[in-house]
Amino acid sequence: MTEMEASFRSYRNDATNVTKLSNHDEDRTLSRLGGDISKAKIAAAILLTISGSPYIYYGEEIGMLGMKASGDENVREPFLWSSIQSDKYRTKWINPLFSTESSVKPLDLQRNDKNSIFRVYEKFLKLRNTYQSLALGDMTYPANLDSYDKNFMIFFREYAGEKLMIIHNVSSNTSTIAISDPIVRAVADMGSVTYSKINTQSHSVTMPPYSTIIFEL
């Protein structure tokens, strides 16, 4: 976490950083993550809550696969809009090796699946459009950052009096964290996060593997 903080602070503050998980010249995110959809979801949640202007390479939002070593065309395979029998928009210029009917659920099916990676992108993009602090705000860190378990990625986004606290559990373990910041309410979560008040000044937050919670302060 401290490495990330140092990296962000090294960037110019008079320009907007462009953030991404992958592009057309790299292996697709889900392939780099060994096909682990939970890791791809937390990566998306992080991308859409950190500062900067996020760039989403087409197909990331439905978990498309692709490895550049097999050729550039295989990280640029056709987008799966719907089941192939009814997909009039799917291009035919290549027979895909990675993003096929058996490996990637088409968009029309993911729209109706509350646990799909598409719904993660949809949720966090809506949050960015709802909370100006996520889209435009400064990104800062708790003063006691080093005291937190390294399983957690914790930061604040703040803009025009609006302040959010974002906590990501980036590990494969369920972990609990105590926070003393004055919580107004939970804005959103990913992964069935639970929290309870310990006393008037602190809360206990239990986070499943690769989960996220956003608090309004």
Task: Label the model's feature ranges.
Residues H24, F124, Y210:
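A residue-level signal for conserved active-site and pocket-lining positions in enzyme catalytic cores
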Residues T2-E3, R12-D14, R28, G34-T176:
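Loop/helix patches that line or flank the sugar-binding groove of alpha-linked glycan CAZymes
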Residues T174-Y195:
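Beta-strand-rich binding/interaction modules
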Residues N17-D27:
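Aromatic- and acid-rich polysaccharide-binding/catalytic face
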Residues R9:
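Metal-dependent DNA phosphodiester-chemistry modules and their immediately adjacent helices/loops
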Residues I198-L217:
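C-terminal beta-strand-rich structural cap/linker in extracellular carbohydrate-active enzymes
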